[in-house]
């Protein structure tokens, strides 16, 4: 997955205009968009990651990093402005640090254990600048200097700020301000002479001098082709040149002095596996030092390994089943020289200096060889010191039949002593693939010392913290200056040079009274001039000069509407649709809106499931985790069809038994006796004596067909407990098992009165109608006052127990939501429910409904049994009263 980082020059010099009429910054923005369009033609561009860095100070210069998406990248690119200095060196260091942010965490660099070309993160930095002088706060610089100190942990392990899979390319804009008279000839794009060119060469890239729009497009196409997966290596010749050419003659031109192919700084292509899409390798490139187990630290390595090649022709060694790595070299003078020799069957061994323990040049770890078709040069990477190992392995498989004798083991053990310890792991894996897993002892120590491993782990943790900090700081806007500090333009003169110096002396000595000091606000030390805040809209209703000329008529209409409106409404400074108008581009930017809203308060109930943000449809939820809100969805369709219209709203309970209570069926002609509470199954019925007599309510006959819920509510309000005398106290500790004598007496009075289906709100009206029929006006007024007293008493009792029931309901619902099957607390809380029987029955039905929503089957069955026990007790009381 290539990383494409664009470093755009946002200094003030980018505001200059070319002959096309556009500024350099606009040309740079267009170049980035053109590059992305050209890159999108390649199917491999799906995994590209784009980053954007400018010349602003850290962290404001990082516009798009590791977490920002493509939309954020394009938005930040369009909003760039050319202001500030040309701090190109600091911005380049910021770009490299941004790319190296996660390398210690992922372990790509593999410090101290060899360089693995197949562990890479290919990155290309495209810098677009105007090539002007490098200006900083300290002055103008002629050379490009990158800061040596870096806040990134582990930066001391590498000498350079970049890595071997990171390359820098620069587009230096040299477009003239006037149109060229002569037509330019199509030639190769030249290197630029700006200070950034040297930095490009060091990283393995190059610079382009852009003098026209045609050359710019040509450079962009060339850059797209440069996106290759690979690492940069320094190839240097070791030893004498090859003396003989293919025709047997020496080349006098090439034999004199240093040639370009003697030292090349080029890329080797690391091709990804077609099946997995990830490069696969077996052998590392050796380190330039011999690892010491007693060393507490690691020596810093160079970004690009120095690989020496010897011009000695040798036969390429390969044996069966031994894995090797093959990398193609980028075209260079070295590859051209090797191909011109036309010797595809010979190779040149390669070394890494100081990689061996006792040899300065080191032992060969591979070789350079031209392809059979003579169209490219490949680097073959084999085990370290392969000229010794491969013959031993060949003898083991062919002569000893995979059974090593003692005579064979002695040279093999000597080879292991000359091999760097970090090759033990890859060699064990290769021998396992070849069928000899037990050839090397498991007791061999390889790797790094304990102190070095601890040091690398500590650096990895610090790098993770720094990575989170940098990623969190990306996207912050540069703090705007609210004022301009005023500085004195001239230095203050000494008091001795002032014209009134003598008078000042007399004032000091007291000969002359002191004059009041004249304060000049322009010379005040902390004087500042406020700047206009662009985020605050001008209050046009305060200052008429803030109204744009094109909006005068609209503003006049709005002022007239505010004047004619009622004073109760608020004055509006803008239209209603204008307050909610937003560009279409920003309508879907929901994440940006969430960043600016304040953090929500903590939940009052931690056990309550949190509602996730569903942008778009607020009712869009995952069906797997959605709670059933309607009880009908929990019952099968046959049960819904067989539902009777006279039954109560108790849907949603599985295996539902028919309820035998007459209170929950259609209203009978003879009212039933109502009890207060039943504690549970098999509880004895205790009778409490009530000391006061109960007044009998006036019988009212109504022939109306009402639903069961209305009937239950009316029965609740018409309970006999509402007519108890003042000295009767209904305590909170009543259980469902108590059945007072007041209920028995009430049943007799209700039976005598006939139908008891009336509402307490209609009590006064009914009594008034009765008295009107009898013609007794005084009795009418007396009964009306009595009814008003009873209604007031009922309202007071309702307020007393309803508040307690609300608290109990919240506690019970909280217990229902908890996981597990411990429901003892729920039944304990149900005993504390206050109110008459119907209030408690409705409360219990609501609890069953909530248990149905959360699919608490065991709790539903227990609550149903609890409810049936209440109905059974009630029927027993009704039977006794009828007898």
Swiss-Prot record:
Single GO MF annotation: protein-macromolecule adaptor activity
Keyword check for Ligase: no
GO biological process, one term: protein localization to chromatin
Domain VWFA per the UniProt entry, residue ranges: 3-227
Compartments in which it is found: Nucleus; Chromosome
InterPro entries: INT_SG_DDX_CT_C, Integrator_subunit6, VWF_A, vWFA_dom_sf
Main location: nucleus
Entry function: Component of the integrator complex, a multiprotein complex that terminates RNA polymerase II (Pol II) transcription in the promoter-proximal region of genes.
Family: Belongs to the Integrator subunit 6 family.
Domain-related comment: The inhibitory loop acts as a regulator of protein phosphatase 2A (PP2A) activity: Asp-629 and Glu-630 residues mimic phosphoserine and phosphothreonine residues and bind to the PP2A catalytic subunit PPP2CA active site to block substrate-binding.
Name the UniProt record assigns to this protein: Integrator complex subunit 6-B
């Amino acid at each position: 997955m290539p990383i494409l980082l664009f470093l755009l020059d946002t200094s003030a010099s980018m505001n200059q205009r070319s002959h096309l009429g556009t500024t350099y910054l606009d040309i740079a923005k267009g170049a980035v968009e053109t590059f992305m369009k050209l890159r999108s033609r390649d199917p491999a561009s799906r995994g590209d990651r784009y980053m954007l860095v400018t010349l602003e100070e850290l962290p404001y210069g990082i516009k798009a990093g590791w977490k920002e998406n493509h939309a954020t990248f394009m938005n930040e690119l369009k909003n760039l402005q050319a202001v500030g200095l040309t701090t190109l060196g600091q911005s380049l260091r910021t770009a490299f640090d941004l790319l190296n942010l996660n390398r210690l965490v992922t372990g790509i660099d593999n410090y101290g254990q060899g360089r693995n070309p197949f562990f890479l993160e290919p990155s290309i930095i495209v810098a677009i600048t105007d090539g002007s002088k490098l200006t900083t706060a300290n002055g103008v610089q002629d050379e490009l200097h990158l800061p040596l100190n870096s806040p990134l942990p582990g930066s001391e392990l590498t000498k350079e700020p970049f890595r071997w899979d990171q390359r820098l390319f620069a587009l230096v804009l040299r477009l003239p301000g006037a149109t060229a008279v002569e037509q330019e000839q199509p030639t190769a794009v030249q290197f630029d002479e700006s200070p950034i060119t040297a930095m490009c060469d060091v990283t393995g890239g190059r610079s382009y001098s852009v003098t026209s729009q045609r050359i710019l497009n040509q450079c962009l196409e060339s850059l797209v082709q440069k996106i290759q997966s690979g690492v940069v290596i320094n190839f240097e010749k070791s030893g004498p040149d090859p003396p003989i050419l293919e025709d047997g003659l020496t080349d006098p031109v090439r034999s004199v002095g240093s040639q370009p192919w003697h030292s090349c700084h080029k890329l080797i292509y690391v091709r990804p596996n077609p099946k997995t899409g990830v490069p696969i390798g077996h052998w590392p490139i050796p380190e330039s030092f011999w690892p010491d187990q007693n060393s507490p630290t690691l020596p810093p390595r160079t970004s690009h390994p120095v690989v020496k090649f010897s011009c000695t022709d040798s036969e390429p060694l390969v044996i069966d089943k031994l894995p090797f790595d093959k990398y193609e070299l980028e075209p260079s003078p070295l590859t051209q020289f090797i191909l011109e020799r036309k010797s595809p069957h010979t190779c040149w061994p390669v070394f890494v200096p100081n990689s061996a323990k006792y040899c300065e040049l080191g032992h060969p770890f591979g070789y350079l060889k031209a392809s059979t078709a003579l169209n490219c040069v490949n680097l073959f990477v084999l085990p370290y010191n392969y000229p010794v190992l491969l013959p031993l392995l060949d003898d083991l498989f062919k002569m000893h039949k995979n059974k090593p004798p003692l005579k064979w083991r002695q040279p093999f053990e000597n080879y292991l002593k000359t091999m760097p310890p970090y090759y033990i792991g890859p060699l064990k894996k290769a021998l396992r693939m070849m069928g000899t897993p037990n050839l090397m002892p498991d007791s061999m120590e390889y790797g790094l010392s304990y102190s070095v491993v601890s040091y690398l782990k500590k650096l990895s943790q610090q790098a993770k913290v720094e990575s989170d900090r940098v990623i969190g700081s990306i996207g912050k806007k540069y703090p705007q200056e609210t004022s301009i500090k005023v500085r004195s333009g001239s230095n203050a003169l000494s008091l001795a040079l002032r014209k009134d110096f003598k008078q000042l002396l007399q004032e000091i000595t007291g000969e002359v009274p002191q004059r009041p000091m004249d304060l000049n606000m322009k010379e005040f030390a902390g004087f500042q001039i406020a700047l206009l805040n662009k985020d605050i809209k001008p209050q046009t209703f305060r200052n008429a000069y803030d109204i744009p000329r094109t909006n005068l008529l609209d503003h006049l209409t709005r002022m007239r509407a505010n004047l004619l409106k009622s004073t109760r409404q608020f004055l509006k400074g803008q239209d209603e649709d204008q307050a909610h108008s937003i560009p279409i581009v920003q309508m879907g930017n929901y994440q940006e809106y969430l960043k600016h809203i304040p953090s929500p308060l903590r939940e009052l109930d931690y056990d309550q499931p949190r509602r996730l943000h569903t942008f778009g449809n607020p009712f869009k939820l995952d069906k797997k985790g959605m709670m059933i809100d309607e009880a009908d969805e929990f019952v099968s369709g046959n049960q819904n069809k067989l539902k009777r219209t006279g039954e109560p709203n108790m849907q949603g309970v599985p295996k539902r038994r028919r309820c035998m209570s007459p209170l929950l069926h259609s209203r009978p002609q003879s009212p039933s006796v109502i009890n207060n509470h039943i504690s549970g199954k098999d509880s004895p019925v205790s009778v409490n004596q009530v000391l006061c007599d109960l007044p009998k309510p006036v019988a009212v006959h109504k022939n109306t067909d009402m639903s069961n819920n209305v009937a239950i509510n009316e029965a609740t309000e018409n309970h006999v407990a509402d007519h108890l005398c003042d000295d009767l106290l209904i305590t909170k500790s009543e259980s469902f098992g108590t059945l007072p004598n007041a209920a028995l007496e009430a049943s007799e009075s209700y039976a005598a009165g006939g139908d008891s289906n009336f509402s307490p709100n209609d009590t006064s009206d009914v009594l008034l109608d009765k008295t009107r029929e009898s013609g007794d006006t005084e009795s009418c007024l007396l009964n009306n006052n009595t009814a008003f007293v009873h209604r007031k008493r009922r309202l007071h009792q309702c307020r007393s127990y309803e508040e307690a029931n609300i608290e109990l309901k919240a506690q019970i619902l909280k217990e229902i939501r908890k996981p597990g099957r411990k429901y003892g607390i729920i039944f304990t809380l149900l005993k504390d429910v206050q109110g008459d029987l119907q209030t408690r029955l409705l409360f219990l039905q609501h609890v069953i409904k909530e248990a149905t929503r959360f699919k608490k089957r065991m709790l539903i069955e227990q609550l149903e049994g609890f409810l049936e026990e209440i109905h059974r007790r009630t029927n027993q009381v009704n039977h006794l009263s009828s007898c």
